[in-house]
Amino acid sequence: MAKRVKVVLKEDILSLGKDGDVVEVAPGYARNFLLSQQKALAVTPSVLKQVEYRLAKKAELEAAKKQEAIDFETALKTIGRFSIKKQTGEDGVLFGTVTNGDVSEAIQLATQKEIDRRNIIVPEIHETGKYKVQVKLHSEVTAEINLEVIGN
């Protein structure tokens, strides 16, 4: 059986690992695919230092994004309630429905910060009233906001 070599991955590879992982692979696989396609680097002390530095920077950036999401969650809770005006019939039933795009616009008007509509989970809203809406701000931070739908 051939000796295995260690390489540091430069990108995520489904069958091997994630960016920055040190993995052992067959020499031919390393030489003919990973190294030639520049998907990995041969392990040396200087390469390991570079990888550690890059991973530390990545972790620091991720922590900053998480803290920003937590701060924005606090700001959303401070605001309390967001209101959306929709056209309704006489019985309070909406013409149409309230979408995550509508909620995104309401948040942007109140906070001047844009939230991607795909990160907002809105229940089925077909009439006026008060509702709870989930807003995913980060992979680990989700805010619940109060939404009031008002008819004209």
UniProtKB/Swiss-Prot annotation:
Origin: domain of life: Bacteria
| Keyword list, A-Z | Ribonucleoprotein, Ribosomal protein, RNA-binding, rRNA-binding
Is RNA-binding included in the keywords of this UniProt record? yes
Q: Which Gene3D superfamilies match?
A: Ribosomal protein L9, C-terminal domain, Ribosomal protein L9, N-terminal domain
Query: Which Pfam families does the entry link to?
Result: Ribosomal_L9_C, Ribosomal_L9_N
**GO terms, molecular function:** rRNA binding; structural constituent of ribosome
GO BP annotations, alphabetical order: translation
Q: Please tell me one Gene Ontology term that the record gives under cellular component.
A: ribosome
Main function: Binds to the 23S rRNA.
* Family membership noted in the UniProt record: Belongs to the bacterial ribosomal protein bL9 family.
The record's listing under HAMAP family reads:
Ribosomal_bL9
Protein known as: Large ribosomal subunit protein bL9
